[in-house]
Amino acid sequence: MTRLLASITFAALLCCSTAIAQTRPQDGGHEFEIWAGGGHGTNGSTASDSVFNAGARFGWILTKAHGPGFLRGKFEYAVDAVPVFMVFQPVNRAYGAGFNPVVLKWNFETDSRIVPFVELAGGVLFTNVTVPTGTSDTNFTTSAAIGMHILGEKVAWSVDLRYMHVSNAGLATPNPGINTVQVRVGVGWFFRGHHK
């Protein structure tokens, strides 16, 4: 089932690379991206857990480029819909969905096709069984990522390395949480903003 889901997600990513005009991140512009990622637990009682998730993002590039030297870039606010979130636990497999209403992203300004970024995000996750096992089926997610967009003629590919923490924030006891390191890939488009 996992391989089938991963194959379908990958095929959808490839099929979405249609002829939409590609631009760089611009102030007043927007980003739309379809992404998928996964990783493994890093420590503690949940170190043997693994995750796979896939979703879509819509973002608003809120600023013109500013900042000194290599830190110069544009600030973006985005939201993620996460219809696929799977947690592979030793006892069972959890299927869920989530929503990240807060994604804060800094797109560094470059003259090349490579646009590095850093990101902080937070959201909520609902699963069919408790995550971690014996805790809660409602959890909160926080993540930090470093990655890059690779700008093509029609689409922008992205890849990032992400640290994600999943926790019930005290809704249930115990609250061991799951800490994962993930790799995420995506395909998306930057749309020009409307200027008056």
Predicted regions and their residues:
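Short loop/turn motifs that connect adjacent beta-strands in outer-membrane beta-barrel proteins
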Residues: A21-G29, T63-F75, E109-V115, L151-W157, ...
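Short glycine/proline- and aromatic-enriched beta-strand/turn motifs that initiate or cap beta-hairpins
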Residues: A21-T63, T180-K196
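Predominantly the C-terminal beta-signal and adjacent terminal strand-loop region
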Residues: T23-G28, G147-K196
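Residues that define the transmembrane beta-barrel architecture of outer-membrane proteins
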Residues: G28-H30, S48-A54, R93-N100, I114, ...
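Transmembrane beta-strands of outer-membrane beta-barrel proteins
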Residues: H30-I34, G73-A81, P116-G122, T142, ...
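Residues on the lipid-exposed face of transmembrane beta-strands in outer-membrane beta-barrel proteins
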Residues: I34-G38, A54-W60, V102-F108, L120-V124, ...
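Extracellular loop and loop/strand-boundary signature of outer-membrane beta-barrel proteins
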Residues: T42-G44, Q89-V91, N128-G134, A169-N175
